[in-house]
Structures are given as C-alpha cells and as structure tokens.
C-alpha cells in the first residue's frame, strides 16, 4: 500500500462505535456494499432484558433487505397465531375502560412487510449472526471506545479491552457514533444535547406468573398493557408478555431513592 503525505495505514473504511441494533444495522448496510468496517461493541453478548420489543413495518422492511427478516421472525417468542398488539386501560388493568393501542395492522397496506414483536436480545442475536456472514465486517466484542478524534486523513478511535489490559487505536476514513445517549463519539464530536431533568425513576422487572396469563384472558390477542392513572402524573404502568403463558416484564415509576434492595 502506498501512503502519502504522512498518512497512517487505515484498519477499515468505517469504524462503528456501538454494536446495538443501530450499529449492527449500519454494519450490515455497509457490509452488503463491500465497504470495510469495524464494529466496536462493549458487550460480548446482548443484554438479556426484554426491552424494545415492538418492530414496526418499516423496521422489518430494513430487515428484509438486510437478509435477516426470516431469522428475526423465527426468533419470535409468542406463537404466530397469537396477537402482538396492545391496549391502554384507565385507572386499573381490570377496570371497565380500555382501548386498543398501536394497531399497526391498520397501516399494513402501506408497507411491504408485517410488523413483528420479540425481545430485543433475540433480535440483536439475529443481527449479529448476519454480520458474521459478511466478510467486509469485523466485530470487536468486549471492547470499549475511550476516545474519538480526527485529523486531515481520517478518524481514530482509541479502544480498550474490557476483560483485559489491551489497548489499541483503530483508524478509518470515518467514525460513526451508534453508542447511545451517553455517546463518546457524540461528545468528542462536539454535538450537544438539550436535556431536562426529572425526579422520577422507573423500574423494569421480569417475572413469571401463569395466574396473570389466566387473568388477562379477558383481553384476547394482546401482548402489552398500559395503565394510565392521574396519580402517575403522565407516567404509566406498563405490562408486557415475553412469551405466551408465563414470562412478563413490568415497567413502572418508583419513589425517589428506590434501590434494588428496597
């Protein structure tokens, strides 16, 4: 390789900081175009938390063209014949008033694919498998981006191995920040955020209950349930199915000072 004007050899054309759904989606998009890229992701495995479960038709269109749609649908944890829509109840989940919420099937004629629902960790696993099929994509799992900088020749990302002492610098034409709201790439790029503090904390619990499944048979074909109440001051209590019959998640506000021990 010929390097001119003091330019240092590059490891890839693009370094992607963050290997969640956004980072992996970008890696697939670039990899399918034979653009060499490196994904730096701090977690060796997806977090086993059933968040981000609703996938819109537009998201599934992307998955289709990335060659991962069928793998994502196969990872669904609720039977195909059971509904994946939701409802909102007022006051209490067992009250007299509720209405259907996010009826995505109503806009199905405007899209190429159906929507889907599954835990984010299952979806991320499918994306990781697809990335592994692309020769132009290198993944560095278990590595954290410590710094991002640039010069006249491109971008540099200083990374650190989380389960060891190794450090290195990855060089590319471009660095892309896909590392969430506390993005190192965003901060180093001087991109600011406008934030507003609030005094409410939320808890996300995962639990098992077959009794709750039987209790909610009054809402056939529903997979997630919101409860609105004046005392919550605009926040909500949010139940959802992880599978059909036993496993659930619960998202709700908790008093200030709440910890995992109390």
Residue ranges and their predicted role:
Residues 1-11:
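A short, basic/flexible loop-to-alpha-helix module at the beginning of a structural domain
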Residues 6-8, 103-114, 248-257:
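Short glycine/proline-rich turn/loop motifs
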Residues 9-39:
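N-terminal Rossmann-like FAD-binding beta1-loop-alpha1 element of flavoenzymes
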Residues 10-12, 164-174:
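Core beta-strand elements of the Rossmann-like FAD/NAD(P) dinucleotide-binding domain
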Residues 48-130, 229-232, 240-241:
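Active-site-adjacent segment of FAD-dependent monooxygenases/related oxidoreductases
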Residues 129, 174, 178-262:
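Conserved FAD-binding catalytic core of PHBH/FMO-like flavoproteins
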Residues 141-156:
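A conserved short coil-to-beta-strand element within the FAD-binding core of flavoproteins
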């Amino acid at each position: 390789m010929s390097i001119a004007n003091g330019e240092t050899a590059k490891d890839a054309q693009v370094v992607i900081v963050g290997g969640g759904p956004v980072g992996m989606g970008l890696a697939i998009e670039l990899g399918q175009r034979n653009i060499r890229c490196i994904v730096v992701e701090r977690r060796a495995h997806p977090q086993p938390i059933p968040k981000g479960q609703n996938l819109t038709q537009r998201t599934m269109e992307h998955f289709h063209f990335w060659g991962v749609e069928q793998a994502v649908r196969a990872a669904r944890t609720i039977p195909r014949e059971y509904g994946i829509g939701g409802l909102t109840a007022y006051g209490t989940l067992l009250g007299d008033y509720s209405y259907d919420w996010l009826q995505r099937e109503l806009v199905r004629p405007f899209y190429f694919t159906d929507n889907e629902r599954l835990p984010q960790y299952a979806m991320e696993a499918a994306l990781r498998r697809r990335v592994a099929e692309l020769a132009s994509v290198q993944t560095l799992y278990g590595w954290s981006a410590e710094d991002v900088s640039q010069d006249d020749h491109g971008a540099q990302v200083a990374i650190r191995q989380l389960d060891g002492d190794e450090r290195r610098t990855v060089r590319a034409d471009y660095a892309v920040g896909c590392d969430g709201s506390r993005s190192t790439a965003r901060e180093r790029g001087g991109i600011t955020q406008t934030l507003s503090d609030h005094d409410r904390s939320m808890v996300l619990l995962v639990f098992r209950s077959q009794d709750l499944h039987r209790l909610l048979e009054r809402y056939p074909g529903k997979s997630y349930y919101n409860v609105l109440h004046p005392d919550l001051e605009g926040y909500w209590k949010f139940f959802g199915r992880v599978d059909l019959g036993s496993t659930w998640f619960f998202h709700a506000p908790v008093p200030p000072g709440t910890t995992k021990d109390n």
